[in-house]
Amino acid sequence: MPDVVDVLDLDKKDMIKIFELAEDIEYKKLHKSKWCALENKTVSLLFVEPSTRTRLSFEESAKRLCAHTLTIVGEEASSFVKGESLYDTIKVLDKISDIIVIRHNLDGSAKYASEVAANPVINAGDGKNQHPTQSLIDLYVVRKRKGGLEDLRYAVVGDLRYARTARSFLLALTKFKPRSVYLVAPEVLKPSIKFLEELKSMGLNVFEVDRLEDVIPNVDVIYVTRIQKERFPDPSEYEKVKGSYKITLDLIKRGKGDLIVLHPLPRVDELDVRIDSTPHAAYFDQVAASVPVRMATLAWSAGVV
């Protein structure tokens, strides 16, 4: 049964299968039909790093599939405070559950967990590295709003150095051949040259631009991230860049009529709240999609579909 640790663990066919399954789940919910795909299964949720939306949506997803859930939140709530290693924690959870969902502040922690565990591991965010289920949610919403994922123009805006959501989103896009992807970030938040080269080597038509204003008339999708304050090694560096960009309603009005704006949330001050009431806002669609997409991912990883 497959892990979902890196978005590149999934090929295009896998992603489309998850999207189609999520659509079926939404249809079932609309018609009050229950799907107990994980009945008599146990899903362990190890959330060492703080989380609200991701943890709650995984809990709800597992419960809607009729699974039992075991939730460990924060280092203080686990045996880590007693000195237990991540290795031992994963070993224990692997013996009493069928799937492990892990969120951790260390890059590569989910990959490590998958090497320790015999059962499937799903990465709910590991440091600044990746957040694969969020990228599935993001692409699911784009697909739903745009009727497909191919041949679109994207702008990815904000913290492109530390935001794992942006990193996973860009890697996921490599599967769908967008027409172009514009990266817009303050100098200190630009992606590394190594990551840019990786994206280009996978065929992504990616361009760094200084101003969103210069490309917004041609863009179909804008993906915005907050500045990841908690990931800065030096707090004074965060102070220099906080508030350095904002997507305003006036700026959005300069784009296409069917332009959509995504944001993985939470937001701080980088996204104008006036956009919320316009057809451009797709970020609350992302919240709504989080449960069906994560239900589909859990079922796929468990091998029941």
Swiss-Prot record:
Catalytic reaction equation(s): carbamoyl phosphate + L-aspartate = N-carbamoyl-L-aspartate + phosphate + H(+)
One Gene Ontology MF term: amino acid binding
InterPro entries, per database record: Asp/Orn_carbamoyltranf_P-bd, Asp/Orn_carbamoylTrfase, Asp/Orn_carbamoylTrfase_sf, Asp_carbamoyltransf, Asp_carbamoyltransf_Asp/Orn-bd
BP-aspect Gene Ontology terms: 'de novo' pyrimidine nucleobase biosynthetic process; 'de novo' UMP biosynthetic process; amino acid metabolic process
EC number: 2.1.3.2
Keyword Transferase: yes
Annotated residues for binding of carbamoyl phosphate: 53-54, 103, 131, 134, 265-266
Binding site for L-aspartate: 82, 164, 226
Alphabetized UniProt keyword annotations: Pyrimidine biosynthesis, Transferase
Pathway assignment: Pyrimidine metabolism; UMP biosynthesis via de novo pathway; (S)-dihydroorotate from bicarbonate: step 2/3
Subunit structure: Heterooligomer of catalytic and regulatory chains.
NCBIfam families: asp_carb_tr, PRK00856.1
Role according to the record: Catalyzes the condensation of carbamoyl phosphate and aspartate to form carbamoyl aspartate and inorganic phosphate, the committed step in the de novo pyrimidine nucleotide biosynthesis pathway.
Family statement drawn from the similarity comment of this UniProt entry: Belongs to the aspartate/ornithine carbamoyltransferase superfamily. ATCase family.
Protein name: Aspartate carbamoyltransferase catalytic subunit
